Amino acid sequence: MKKFDEINIIPFIDIMLVLLAIVLVTASFISQGKIQVNVPKASTTQPMKADDLAKLLTITENNEFFFNDQAITKEQLIAEVATWDKSQKVSLKVDGAVAFEKFVELTDILSANEIKNVAIITKKETAPAPSSTPGSPAQVPAVAP
């Protein structure tokens, strides 16, 4: 019978790489948030830092309020915001289908508590693709006579 002089670490490395892949995939899903919201597009969008999401207020298309991905009633939200420091950073994530009235309600709650450091989460608006294809005549804007 053959005696092994060394420990074979190749299977150990294989297992560690699989675990690393699982952790990376899981971490990417966690950072995206759990609540599906179709935010509006804006041309002047700026990337956010991780600390900017310290207080995240969300309104879904069903007009439901969420605070840091936890469902909350309007009354609970008013009580929660009242405990915040006036210099608190707040991010608003509002679905594009939400009535403007709900957005105003949310900003009114913040304004009543003198919270002024507010960011609105939007999607980066992409430039429209050229409508002409290779080999087709370019479109010329019409000029009124």
UniProtKB/Swiss-Prot annotation:
This is Biopolymer transport protein ExbD. The accessory proteins ExbB and ExbD seem to form a complex with TonB. It comes from Mannheimia haemolytica (Pasteurella haemolytica). Involved in the TonB-dependent energy-dependent transport of various receptor-bound substrates. Belongs to the ExbD/TolR family. Residues 126-145 are annotated as: Disordered. Residues 31-145 are periplasmic. GO terms for molecular function: transmembrane transporter activity. Disulfide bonds: none annotated. The keyword Transmembrane applies. Pfam families: ExbD. It comes from the Bacteria. Residues 127-138 have a biased composition (Low complexity). The gene is exbD.
